[in-house]
A protein has these predicted regions:
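Active-site loop/lid in soluble adenylation, ligation, and acyl-transfer enzymes
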Residues: 1-152, 262-289
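Coil-to-beta-strand transition motifs
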Residues: 28, 103-105, 199-202, 214-217, ...
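Surface-exposed helix-capping loop/turn segments at secondary-structure junctions
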Residues: 67-73, 190-202, 215, 289-290
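Anionic ligand-binding catalytic core segments
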Residues: 124-128, 132-176, 219, 223-288
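A long amphipathic alpha-helix within ATP-dependent nucleotide-binding catalytic cores
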Residues: 172-203
Length: 290
């Protein structure tokens, strides 16, 4: 039963894997985070209760915390400024009024540790996205410094593809690529330092950037949530093993072991796995913001 968000009086202009966008005017839109969950680029039938609210709170926390590094998509307005009260009441904890930006056509991924597709690439070639790494690194090795490893943006339902920095420059231009790389690494570095003080290692994360009407690079979409990042607990971190994470890893692991072929439709996820996932998202919010 895929979650249906309340019908709003605004015009829906986009429905993504997790978020729906509504038009306010030519400068602003409303972004609403659903409880939908995607794994292996397939949207699961079962929503994760309150996930959209938790993700929105985590994102908003980081947008504010990192505002000194660069501008973000906030307009400063609340949902009550753009919706009738009865509609705003229903989505106030999962919606944000944001600027309409021209999205940059790459996924800006920063890695501080080696795991996932980065580890796979490294094992095969000794590099990630064309960047040479030292020999002898293993699962969960901390990198000497954070690296920018962009991927191309594919259509919903397709897998994003890791690209080299040179390919990134080709796609978006050398000047913009340099700005994106610098800002992405600065955001990751500041966030990772803060998170460590709260007992969380940010292994890697994906940022989304856009350009405003004046061509100013602006942080958008979601920031440093368990959906866009891998969070590990300092307590369970150990080089050489894949640490448990504060995100949909429970569900991904269950799906990996279920014999599913990773094509839609996905199998039904057991209630206890869904509850564990909610608890992990909530724990990430509590640790980061308290």
């Amino acid at each position: 039963m895929t979650q249906q968000l309340p019908t709003l009086s605004l015009k829906k202009i986009y429905s993504g894997k997790v978020r729906d966008l509504y038009e306010i005017d030519d400068k602003r839109m409303l972004m609403v985070a659903s409880d939908r969950l995607s794994a292996f680029d397939v949207i699961l039938d079962d929503p994760i209760p309150r996930k959209g609210e938790i993700l929105t709170q985590i994102s908003n926390f980081w947008f504010n915390k990192l505002a000194h590094i660069m501008p973000n998509h906030f307009t400063g307005e609340s949902v009550y400024d753009v919706l009738p009260k009865e509609e705003a009441d229903l989505i106030k904890d999962r919606a944000v009024v944001c600027k309409r930006l021209n999205p940059i056509k790459i996924e800006s991924i920063v890695r501080g540790y080696l795991t996932g597709s980065g580890l796979k690439d490294y094992k095969q070639t000794g590099t990630i996205c064309g960047l040479k790494l030292p020999e002898g690194l293993v699962e969960a090795s901390k990198l000497a410094e954070p690296i920018f490893t962009p991927s191309s943006k594919e259509a919903v339902g397709s897998h994003d593809i890791n690209i080299s920095y040179a390919e990134c420059e080709k796609l978006i231009g050398a000047d913009l690529a340099a700005q994106v790389k610098e800002k992405a690494i600065a955001l990751y570095t500041a966030a990772a330092e803060y998170a460590l003080t709260k007992g969380i290692i940010i292994c890697d994360t994906k940022f989304e950037f856009g350009l405003d009407e004046n061509g100013m690079l602006t942080l958008m979409d979601e920031v440093l949530t368990p959906d866009s990042s891998r969070f590990w607990s300092i307590d369970t971190y150990q080089e050489g093993i894949n640490p448990p994470s504060f995100d949909k890893q429970f569900i991904r692991d269950w799906l990996e072991n279920s014999g599913w072929n990773k094509q839609a439709p996905a199998p039904k996820v057991p209630e206890n796995i869904i509850q564990k996932t909610v608890d992990k998202y909530q724990e990430a919010l509590d640790l980061l913001t308290k």
